[in-house]
Amino acid sequence: MTQNPKRYTITAALPYTNGPIHIGHLAGVYVPADIYSRYLRLQGKDVAFICGSDEHGVAISMKAKKEGVTPQEVIDKYDGIIRKSFADFGISFNNYSRTSAKIHHDTASEFFRTLYDKGDFIEEVTEQLYDAKANQFLADRFVVGTCPKCDNPEAYGDQCEKCGSTLNATDLINPKSTITGETPILKETKHWFLPLDRYSDFLTKWILEGHKNDWKPNVYGQVKSWIDGGLEPRAVTRDLDWGIDVPVEGAEGKKLYVWFDAPIGYISSTKEWAAREGKDWEPYWKDEETKLVHFIGKDNIVFHCIIFPAMLKAEGSYILPDNVPANEFLNLEGNKLSTSKNWAVWLHEYLEEFPDKQDVLRYALTSNAPETKDNDFTWKDFQARNNNELVAIFGNFVNRVVVLTNKYYDGVIPTPNEFTEIDEQTLAELKAYPAVISSSVERYRFREALGELMNVARLGNKYLADEEPWKVMKDNPERVKTQMYVALQIAAALSVLAEPFLPFTAAKLSKILNLGDLKEHFEGFSKFLKERHQDANDIIIDKTLGWNDISENSDLIPAGHKIGEAELLFAKIEDEEIQKQIDKLEATKTANIAENQKAEPQKDLIQFEDFAKMDIRIGTILEAEKMPKANKLLVLKVDTGIDVRTIVSGIAESFSPEEIIGKRVSVLANLAPRALRGVESQGMILMTTNAEGKLVFVNPDADAPNGATVN
């Protein structure tokens, strides 16, 4: 663990440009990384918060083929969407680059050449899967088959998304090409491999011995499992037509493997930022007094904790990550998030449909963050978090303080009189919160830290509820001056402590309190007010108060200062807004079922005479009742136009008797009678299933009379 670092390099996993950003990405990576970076800046730390678009690899080529465009058009489209979404959502990157940039191609090529020239790669001719019909090798997601570890029949050539195992394409059982559907053959090809087995002792000492107590159990456990299972050489090149050329002779038609190329994107993005800011990039990656932290999802643990560190170690001049606080997965309404199935809450759509509610989503995702286990996002929980917590606790406290200050003192903060024991206890408790929240943030427990932030608002609400200044004002207005002064100190503290978690709210609260007018007052406070930080998204962080000022000063907002009028920080979200989102997901679910529903194979051929033997009539259900002691059966009286007959039908789990009386149906009238539970059934009701797999009646769309035949 890096002690007292001079600077921080914070990386967030490069989002893949084959689709927009969804809430799973935010909860797993970008919101916690942003909280951490903003927190460090509030302490005046030197922070480089780095990210960029991951634009190479098989998934990009597949997306381009599917959309009938070039890979460049695909990455340009999604890089634009992703970049704008992050900016609008307030993710405060110092630099957001892209791996298609020249600086990245140069950096990745140079990194490869360094290891190549040092003899760190194994050059080997191996047999790889090849699609003879498409005339190309099948890397990664160009092939699908059964996972050898969990029997998932839809595992990819690089990873099984069901069990999380990292695979080679040749590991798959019964592989199929995703290009043509053909069974691939094995064909020889030359590639370069990073011999991970050579780094097993280094990784064991560095991680298993050195980070046993400070890395998250889910990360440590997965890494230990990999190391204990025995590390093997890992390919760093691929037979592809999209990506970074392998920069050595004899490598024509080969590209750098995306998981060799992508993490180097952190370095090239840092170079890009440093060049723009007139800084030296190397200390952020090569100085032992720099703390390097990778924020990722659990599916990237092996790459950031084993492969990339082995690459850095092999190169020889880079520092290693101090921590990799990977999160588990976020599910949506009980189901796994899926870009391909459109089962997601897309960030760009959320920002359009919930304008000015960036912080509500940040709050909901952090409150329910999958820090140690998979968690579930539901729209009802999102609504409850907003209405019952942000509105009722945080917003309610601030609104009461500002309204009362304007009502009693025309917005001018009163001079306090003598503090009571309750006042002093409340202010002392307030001063303790920065350290409490810091402890959680610095251990990457952001959900816990957010809970402590809300406890600050609860402290304010409790103080007002116990002191009741609106009642005291009648008999002791001098006492109310002190009460309001104390409450305003809590509000001022919230404007700082909320900034990492709820940056838009913090900025709005700072504006309401007119903290920008207090620079002279804060001259004796932290040096941070003299610094102005501007990130790549043009989000200005211009705080007049630093994090530690709350613990060190009692007059965060002084007597005589005039605040602004009250504005609602949060608005209640109505049921109709939430139902609209739930309906949207239900429509997606129905569409997915319809798309994935495969028709049953055609039955053996019959002669026309065989069909002509069936007497199918239109009828109407006159009566319906449940069959005693039979959960699946209904006893129906049906007018077939020929007669009224009894038919026993196995539809009780799909329909109640009441809802089908009067229903028009198709009846196989000349089916031989059959006794079911002692009741003779004289025919069969024809049914099918809809896109959701539910039983539905086969009935005429025109007004055919009972007894009409189906020919």
From Swiss-Prot:
Where on this chain does Zn(2+) bind?
C147, C150, C160, C163
GO CC terms: cytosol
Q: Where is this motif: 'KMSKS' region?
A: 336-340
This entry's Gene Ontology molecular function terms read:
ATP binding; metal ion binding; methionine-tRNA ligase activity; tRNA binding
* Short motif 'HIGH' region, span: 15-25
Specify the enzyme's EC class, one word.
ligase
Catalysed reactions, semicolon-separated: tRNA(Met) + L-methionine + ATP = L-methionyl-tRNA(Met) + AMP + diphosphate
Write down the superkingdom of origin: Bacteria
Spell out the coiled coil positions from the record: none
Keywords linked to the UniProt accession: Aminoacyl-tRNA synthetase, ATP-binding, Cytoplasm, Ligase, Metal-binding, Nucleotide-binding, Protein biosynthesis, RNA-binding, tRNA-binding, Zinc
**Necessary cofactors:** Zn(2+)
User: What EC designation does it have?
Assistant: 6.1.1.10
Classification via Pfam families: Anticodon_3, tRNA-synt_1g, tRNA_bind
Q: Is the keyword Aminoacyl-tRNA synthetase in the record? A: yes
- List where in the cell it is found: Cytoplasm
Q: Where is the tRNA-binding domain?
A: 610-711
Q: Indicate yes or no for the key word Protein transport.
A: no
* InterPro entries hit by this protein: aa-tRNA-synth_I_CS, Anticodon_Met, Met-tRNA-synth_bsu_C, Met-tRNA_ligase_1, Met-tRNA_synth, Methionyl/Leucyl_tRNA_Synth, MetRS_core, MetRS_Zn
Note accompanying the cofactor annotation: Binds 1 zinc ion per subunit.
The biological processes this protein is annotated with in GO are: methionyl-tRNA aminoacylation
Q: Which residues bind ATP?
A: T339
Free-text function comment from the UniProt entry: Is required not only for elongation of protein synthesis but also for the initiation of all mRNA translation through initiator tRNA(fMet) aminoacylation.
On subunit structure and binding partners, the annotation says: Homodimer.
Enumerate the NCBIfam families for this protein. Answer: metG (TIGR00398), metG_C_term (TIGR00399), PRK00133.1 (NF001100)
What does the sequence similarity comment in the record state about its family?
Belongs to the class-I aminoacyl-tRNA synthetase family. MetG type 1 subfamily.
Q: What is this protein called?
A: Methionine--tRNA ligase
Q: Which organism is it from?
A: Flavobacterium johnsoniae (strain ATCC 17061 / DSM 2064 / JCM 8514 / BCRC 14874 / CCUG 350202 / NBRC 14942 / NCIMB 11054 / UW101) (Cytophaga johnsonae)
